[in-house]
């Protein structure tokens, strides 16, 4: 697999489209950090790291509105890819839907949202947009 982050986002999108409650994805440190950010920002209900085998898996519980059965995540968009990396400085930090969504940035201080990176005045690689 050439792009594990794109695979992770696609698995989440497919599970949302099929109205699954839980999706299980192969684990990596970067995926764990992205999942933690999605949980902290309220886009997913819960997550659990399961160590089964050399790599392990992440079980992600998706968050749905109780009335309309609409998912909290409207769109997951991969920005930087292995073939075409996209970097940004803190002054040019992307605003996703005028601040309603988040951009997940991989920086020298770890993986964080665009707002956190701008506050710390550090740039990095734009991994994806979530809204």
Swiss-Prot record:
Keywords attached to this entry: Ribonucleoprotein, Ribosomal protein, RNA-binding, rRNA-binding
Record Pfam families: Ribosomal_S8
GO cellular component: cytosolic small ribosomal subunit
GO biological process, one term: translation
Gene3D superfamilies: 3.30.1370.30, 3.30.1490.10
One annotated GO molecular function: structural constituent of ribosome
Assigned protein family: Belongs to the universal ribosomal protein uS8 family.
Subunit structure and binding partners: Part of the 30S ribosomal subunit. Contacts proteins S5 and S12.
Role this protein plays: One of the primary rRNA binding proteins, it binds directly to 16S rRNA central domain where it helps coordinate assembly of the platform of the 30S subunit.
Name recorded for this polypeptide: Small ribosomal subunit protein uS8
């Amino acid at each position: 697999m050439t792009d594990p982050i794109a695979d992770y986002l696609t698995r989440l999108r497919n599970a949302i489209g099929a109205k699954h409650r839980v999706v299980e994805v192969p684990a990596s440190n970067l995926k764990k950090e992205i999942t933690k950010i999605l949980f902290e920002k309220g886009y997913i209900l819960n997550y659990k790291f399961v160590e089964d085998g050399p790599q392990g898996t992440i079980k992600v519980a998706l968050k749905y509105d109780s009335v309309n059965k609409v998912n909290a995540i409207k769109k997951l968009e991969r920005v930087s890819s292995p073939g075409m990396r996209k970097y940004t400085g803190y002054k040019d930090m992307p605003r996703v839907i005028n601040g309603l969504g988040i951009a997940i940035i991989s920086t020298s201080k770890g993986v964080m949202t665009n707002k956190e990176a701008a506050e710390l005045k550090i740039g990095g690689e734009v991994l994806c947009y979530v809204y």
